[in-house]
Amino acid sequence: MSEQNAQGADEVVDLNNEMKARREKLAALREQGIPFPNDFRRDRTSDQLHAEFDAKEAEELEALNIEVSVAGRMMTRRIMGKASFVTLQDVGGRIQLYVARDDLPEGVYNEQFKKWDLGDILGAKGKLFKTKTGELSIHCTELRLLTKALRPLPDKFHGLQDQEARYRQRYLDLISNDESRNTFKTRSKILAGIRQFMVARGFMEVETPMMQVIPGGASARPFITHHNALDLDMYLRIAPELYLKRLVVGGFERVFEINRNFRNEGISVRHNPEFTMMELYMAYADYKDLIELTESLFRTLAQDVLGTTQVPYGDEVFDFGKPFEKLTMREAIKKYRPETDMADLGNFDSAKAVAESIGIHVEKSWGLGRIVTEIFDEVAEAHLIQPTFITEYPAEVSPLARRNDVNPEITDRFEFFIGGREIGNGFSELNDAEDQAQRFLDQVNAKAAGDDEAMFYDEDYVTALEHGLPPTAGLGIGIDRMVMLFTNSHTIRDVILFPAMRPVK
């Protein structure tokens, strides 16, 4: 047996022995009739205590004689004869307990407390004080075991070192990793901030179907499921767009939705098969209005959630305080590939030659617009580090966007980039029912030619447009990628509580 295998076997034996001992302790609690009490109530969390009392001097705390009740997980314990110090962790952070034998009911210290294990969940009552080193602590007069942990904490509280284990057992990651807990607290604040921002501007939050007969609103491969009662194949939605615009037709002029989308595609540091999007639609507005709204949203969130418009990310610092850069797609190609002749981007054969010269395989179904977009993706996207809006997307790759009045080959559309990745996509909506019907037909033809990400024909949506969609602009923002930026996270798995994982064999 190799040394590594032997070490692994020893760890399994140690774990089994420890779990056996813990189960025996639980059995003893069951015999006493109180294995999982549910009558303990706390009145403060650790962060509340630190916020209110950290600044007070020891003498002031003693004079105030403040009794508190806390509960949480025992993370560390130092037993020093007749007294011990415990680190208790709750949702707000950590607080130190001072546990003295003579200050507890008879038998609690030796017969109960000293037999408890790290990871157990405790309830404690006592008086606030400060230690000689100035640490806010609770001098316990009551201590109870609320939940017996049958498994030990990971690596004796040194944290999870295995990235895979962090994602598969997120509960252990959250117990042992402050950074991970803070990431998801920040995510929650971002979502709350978005909702506050939108409602303040007159938007109504709505919910639209997650299972759809016709998947639409984006170019992507859908997941397929089956409805037994209807004997009908259905699709997990790839986007809520077409349903949200139906609501605008119905008279809800400002709507937004924050929810999951599903795309049956690859997994990477930036892609998860299910992900969170925020989509909004705003009647009597165009894409330029949404550029302003997007810039304001990110600046507001940075200031409100992080307290600054200077957001660090790896070696970069994103500046949300200054005006965001704006480039057309062709301008971006020229900026980051200066040798490009702009005239070549207006001709199919010339653009194809440019694409092939930089290693792009041009599919037979591609038109000029798709080729130019692929060139942009290859030469420019990775360089868009600071917040940047890219405009003038080709109509070929924008089947739901309104054509530009001056040049019908492009659309009134933008994508928003930060850190070399797309974060948002918005455009003036196509509200010409006949044009939309033709673009759906073009997508059907592309699908027949082998493009499995092309859209389906949605007859009911065309019918809705025939009733009249006001001039409208729409925007979609990837929440997971936004959270990555605001938390300095470099893989999407770090900002999704339970990311998609291959099953353990």
UniProtKB/Swiss-Prot annotation:
Its main location: cytoplasm. Homodimer. It is found in: Cytoplasm. The keyword Calcium does not apply. Binds 3 Mg(2+) ions per subunit. Keywords: Aminoacyl-tRNA synthetase, ATP-binding, Cytoplasm, Ligase, Magnesium, Metal-binding, Nucleotide-binding, Protein biosynthesis. The keyword Hydrolase does not apply. Its cofactor is Mg(2+). The gene is lysS. It catalyses: tRNA(Lys) + L-lysine + ATP = L-lysyl-tRNA(Lys) + AMP + diphosphate. It comes from Salmonella paratyphi C (strain RKS4594). It is an enzyme of class 6 (ligase). Mg(2+) 2 binds at residue 422. Mg(2+) 1 binds at residues 415, 422. This is Lysine--tRNA ligase. Its EC number is 6.1.1.6. Belongs to the class-II aminoacyl-tRNA synthetase family. InterPro entries: Aa-tRNA-synt_II (IPR004364), aa-tRNA-synth_II (IPR006195), aa-tRNA-synth_II/BPL/LPL (IPR045864), Lys-tRNA-ligase_II (IPR002313), Lys-tRNA-ligase_II_bac/euk (IPR034762), Lys-tRNA-ligase_II_N (IPR044136), Lys-tRNA-synth_II_C (IPR018149), NA-bd_OB-fold (IPR012340).
